[in-house]
């Protein structure tokens, strides 16, 4: 995938909607009073895996051929992306291998395993785990799904903006958290395509 087009976002949103909850906006009286604006939260923590990451993972896997899915999926993560990929792979009956740093909390390891993924502990930090995952991908023919540096993943995450604007067409500002940048890339790009005047930060 080379470009985030409106058509791709629409496709991703339709595919993602099959397996995710459309988390409804929650009005915050407290923050609205504090800011002088109408403030709403989108509670993605209510998704099946506890985070939005499953959106990007599921859409990415949907773009793979049956042959590639049959070979297996791999990623490196110590948190929500691990669970998103594990859950999405399970829905496709695809093998998932998740490489996690050795200091990953046991609760995250067990949660990832609960979705049927094989967990490999390697390295002290994410970069070590990521390097090892790429090595395993090359050795076994797995498809590596990056947590954020992947336009298909970002396109899947962007489905959040589709839901926000569908539910609240008058929204004029979206405040988006940023880590690696996949969520903010997807949300900001789609929001601007749907409403060029909207502000995203």
Segments predicted by a language model, with ranges:
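PLP-dependent amino-acid enzyme catalytic core
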Residues: 1-201
């Amino acid at each position: 995938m080379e470009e985030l087009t409106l058509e791709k976002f629409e496709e991703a949103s339709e595919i993602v909607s099959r397996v995710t909850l459309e988390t409804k906006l929650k009005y915050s009286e407290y923050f609205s009073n504090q800011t002088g604006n109408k403030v709403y939260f989108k509670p993605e923590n209510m998704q099946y895996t506890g985070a939005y990451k499953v959106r990007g993972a599921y859409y990415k896997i949907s773009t793979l051929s049956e042959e590639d899915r049959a070979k297996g999926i791999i990623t490196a993560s110590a948190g929500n992306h691990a669970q998103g990929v594990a859950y999405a792979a399970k829905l496709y009956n695809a093998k998932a291998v998740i490489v996690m740093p050795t200091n990953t909390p046991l609760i995250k390891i067990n949660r990832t395993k609960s979705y049927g993924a094989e967990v490999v502990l390697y390295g002290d930090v994410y970069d070590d785990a990521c390097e090892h995952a790429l090595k395993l991908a090359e050795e076994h023919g797995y498809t590596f799904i990056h947590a954020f540096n992947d336009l298909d993943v970002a396109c899947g995450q962007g489905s959040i903006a589709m839901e926000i604007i569908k539910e609240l067409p008058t929204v004029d500002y979206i405040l988006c958290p940023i880590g690696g940048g996949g969520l903010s890339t997807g949300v900001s790009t789609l929001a601007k395509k749907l409403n060029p005047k909207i502000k995203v930060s």
